[in-house]
């Protein structure tokens, strides 16, 4: 891309509302940034139909033994990794199901490796390395919408039949042309020109949260609005698990604790045990037949 083309991108444009930010006092600086940030949720709202399509892709992939894979360089890569690594403790999903890949590898998370983003081959090879298949959904994240690393990854993903999603912050972006689903969330110029770690990153973080969370809900890992598949790995999470069980079953603290421990610290199993007055094995069998959905498991027992 020529310099003139780069400057034409919305994400590289100067923001007329913050031209005086360098001369502003500290509170005014914060107010200017906050006023720009308030535009992010509105921009995300406009692309929800496209996010729904991406969610459908990811749900179908995971339901059929595939994966949801995020790729990005710099801030975009960090966002994907952050969303992916939070899913196992929150929803007890295998780390292999939702995967975050960052250009430059794990070390690039804390030490910038900006030059790697210029290689299409690197994007392809990172997918080859994880043995990408046609069952997977690949989400390429790039605020500019023209990062070579993402272009290479999406081209390779399409070539083997994987579903592809492009997440950018510019209209008619290059990666949008390559993907089965294009999400172009237009947040406008940044408060600091070109600093896409600000509004663009906030928008992408919101969308990635929505994407993974919506898929996990559809997988039965949320009941009402409770994280019933939380991985109980410390005291705080054990207390949270007990509270969740109490919310659903109205059990006493002692009864919820006893049942949780009898259920091998599996919240869903404990809930079904209490709601159906069955043992651990029966509760697990009911959940397996219901594909992990608590309400369906209880209905199966009642019928």
Curated annotation (Swiss-Prot):
Group of enzyme by EC: lyase
PROSITE patterns, sorted: GCKR, SIS
Keywords, in A-Z order: Carbohydrate metabolism, Lyase
Recorded GO MF terms: carbohydrate derivative binding; carbon-oxygen lyase activity; ether hydrolase activity
Catalytic activity: N-acetyl-D-muramate 6-phosphate + H2O = N-acetyl-D-glucosamine 6-phosphate + (R)-lactate
Intrachain S-S bonds: none
Catalytic residues in the record: 86 (proton donor), 117
Pfam (any one): GKRP-like_C
Domain (SIS): residue spans on this chain: 58-221
Residue ranges, annotated region (Disordered): 1-21
InterPro entries in the record: Etherase_MurQ (IPR005488), Glucokinase_regulatory_CS (IPR005486), MURQ/GCKR (IPR040190), SIS_dom (IPR001347), SIS_dom_sf (IPR046348)
Pathway annotation from the record: Amino-sugar metabolism; N-acetylmuramate degradation
EC number of the protein: 4.2.1.126
GO-annotated biological processes: amino sugar catabolic process; N-acetylmuramic acid catabolic process; peptidoglycan turnover
Lineage top rank: taxon: Bacteria
Classification via NCBIfam families: N-acetylmuramic acid 6-phosphate etherase (TIGR00274), PRK05441.1 (NF003915), PRK12570.1 (NF009222)
Record's subunit section: Homodimer.
Cited HAMAP family: MurQ
Function according to Swiss-Prot or TrEMBL: Specifically catalyzes the cleavage of the D-lactyl ether substituent of MurNAc 6-phosphate, producing GlcNAc 6-phosphate and D-lactate.
Other information: A lyase-type mechanism (elimination/hydration) is suggested for the cleavage of the lactyl ether bond of MurNAc 6-phosphate, with the formation of an alpha,beta-unsaturated aldehyde intermediate with (E)-stereochemistry, followed by the syn addition of water to give product.
The family this protein is said to belong to: Belongs to the GCKR-like family. MurNAc-6-P etherase subfamily.
Name the record gives this protein: N-acetylmuramic acid 6-phosphate etherase
Species per Swiss-Prot/TrEMBL record: Bacillus pumilus (strain SAFR-032)
Gene that produces this protein: murQ
């Amino acid at each position: 891309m020529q310099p003139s083309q780069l400057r034409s991108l919305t994400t590289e444009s100067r923001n007329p509302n913050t031209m005086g930010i360098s001369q502003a006092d500290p509170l005014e600086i914060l107010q200017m940034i906050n006023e720009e940030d308030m535009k992010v949720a509105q921009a995300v709202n406009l692309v929800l139909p496209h996010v729904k399509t991406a969610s459908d892709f990811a749900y179908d992939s995971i339901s059929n033994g595939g994966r949801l894979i995020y790729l990005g360089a710099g801030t975009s890569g960090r966002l994907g990794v952050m969303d992916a690594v939070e899913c196992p403790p929150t929803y007890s999903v295998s780390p292999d199901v939702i995967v975050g890949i960052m250009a430059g590898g794990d070390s690039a998370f804390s030490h910038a490796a900006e030059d790697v983003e210029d290689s299409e081959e690197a994007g392809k090879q990172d997918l080859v390395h994880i043995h990408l298949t046609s069952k997977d959904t690949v989400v390429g994240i790039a605020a500019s919408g023209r990062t070579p690393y993402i272009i290479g990854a999406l081209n390779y993903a399409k070539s083997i039949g994987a579903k592809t999603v492009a997440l950018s912050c510019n209209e008619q972006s290059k990666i949008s042309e390559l993907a089965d689903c294009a999400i172009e969330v237009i947040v406008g110029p940044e408060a600091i020109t070109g600093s896409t770690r600000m509004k663009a990153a906030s928008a992408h973080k919101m969308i990635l949260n929505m994407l993974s969370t919506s898929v996990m809900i559809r997988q039965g890992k949320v009941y009402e609005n409770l994280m019933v598949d939380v991985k109980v790995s410390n005291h705080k999470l054990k207390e949270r698990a007990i509270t969740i069980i109490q919310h659903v079953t109205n059990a006493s603290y002692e009864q919820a604790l006893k049942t949780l421990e009898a259920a091998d610290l599996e919240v869903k199993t404990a809930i079904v045990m209490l709601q159906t007055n069955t043992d651990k094995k029966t509760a697990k069998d009911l959940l397996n037949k219901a594909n992990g959905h608590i309400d369906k498991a209880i209905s199966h027992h009642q019928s």
